[in-house]
């Protein structure tokens, strides 16, 4: 019985809820300014892939972000700008060089697909912990 108790205690201590895990991630140190080069690979239902190469710059703890699309050639020059505000709706805009126009992403369009991906424009915004539900999934080994 003593050994069983010793085996169960660590499971209880280290068994965190989804909200506790999200809170721990939210509180970890993070850079205030960040620049990165990213590749987004989109795969359609037939297995054909399309790669988007982009450069992203985030400032003020990701409250301000600009993404420049570099690849493929027909998307080169498209830019996305996001500025988050505390006292009003966040700003989101796309520069579309083919039309020589800036397109504002309205609040009702935030759920639309971002550049043909499974991401929505809303997914690119910061999240407040209290506004979401969190569920811890079963532990599993991923990729080996």
What does each of the following model-derived ranges do?
Residues 11, 32, 63:
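Residue-level signal for beta-strand positions within conserved beta-sheet cores that form or flank
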Residues 38-42, 55, 65-71:
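Short beta-strand segments that buttress and anchor functional surface loops
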Residues 57-65, 83-90:
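Short, solvent-exposed coil/turn segments at beta-strand boundaries
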Residues 69, 78-82:
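Extended, compositionally biased flexible segments
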Residues 16-33, 39-41, 48-50, 74-76, ...:
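Flexible, processing/modification-adjacent segments and terminal tails
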């Amino acid at each position: 019985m003593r050994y069983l108790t010793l085996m169960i205690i660590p499971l209880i201590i280290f068994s965190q809820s989804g909200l506790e895990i999200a809170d721990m991630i939210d509180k970890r140190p993070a850079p205030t300014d960040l620049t990165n080069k990213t590749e987004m690979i989109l795969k359609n239902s037939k297995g054909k892939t399309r790669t988007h190469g982009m450069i992203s710059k985030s400032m003020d703890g990701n409250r301000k972000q600009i993404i420049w699309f570099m690849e493929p050639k027909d998307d080169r020059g498209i830019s996305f700008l996001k500025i988050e505000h505390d006292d009003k709706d966040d700003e989101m805009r796309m520069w579309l060089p083919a039309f020589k126009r800036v397109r504002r992403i309205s609040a009702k369009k935030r759920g639309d697909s971002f550049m043909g991906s499974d991401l929505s424009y809303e997914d690119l915004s910061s999240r407040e912990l209290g506004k979401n539900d969190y569920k811890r999934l079963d532990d599993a080994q991923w990729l080996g």
